[in-house]
Amino acid sequence: MKKISLLLILALTFGCKEKPKKESAVEQEISNVSKEKESEWTILFDGTSWDGWHVYSGREIEKAWSLEDGAMLLNKISEARKDGERFNMVTDKEYTNFVLSIEWMVNSGANSGIMWGVVEDEKYNEPYITGPEIQVLDNVAHPDAKNGTTHQAGALYDMVSPAQDVVKPAGEWNHYLITINHDTNEGSVVLNGTKITEFPMNGEAWDDMVANSEFATWEEFGKHKTGKIVLQDHGEPIVIGYRNIKIKEL
């Protein structure tokens, strides 16, 4: 019997036809990234190896993640969780100002996130202690979506809500363009061709956002302009996929 890929199963289980207008916007957005000067973009993940990535705190990648159909999948959690570990994927390099182009997919009820400014140090047992997060979520089936729009896909987690919900259903690929620019004090998220979230990166406005969030008492949260990028393992028995990851440093 031919092996059926997990991505195909997810697509068949959760997929549905997208409206042509929305699909066109996503395709156009990815096409625009591809057409820009090759020298401006660095491929962070080419779909064939773990080059440029490792698991936070040095845990073994393949205990929880696998490579399939050009994507990295967090899909071995039931075995990996025996020791209560989390397997957050982190870049080898650090970045300051950048645009990140990344596709992501979740199964039903899944929760993840994309963090930046992460300091990898043994005194921080989790990347979210230092790194702010753009939420990756199944808005329909995960209970955190009911805790307010600052907890939904595309939000600057617990601080800024997306202006609208343009996320695709579980089992379909979404595309983020995440801009982080400390020099111009601008951060933003474009989801599937629509700019949905904008936020400051520093100054009084940033401090006010943090002060009104669950991170108010976290001394190191959002303090580091330069740091690593993390794809979160939220600690649940879920399937998360990421692919076509590129970065343009500003």
Show where each model-derived region lies.
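Sec-dependent N-terminal signal peptides
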Residues: 4-12
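Carbohydrate-interacting regions of secretory-pathway proteins
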Residues: 17-250
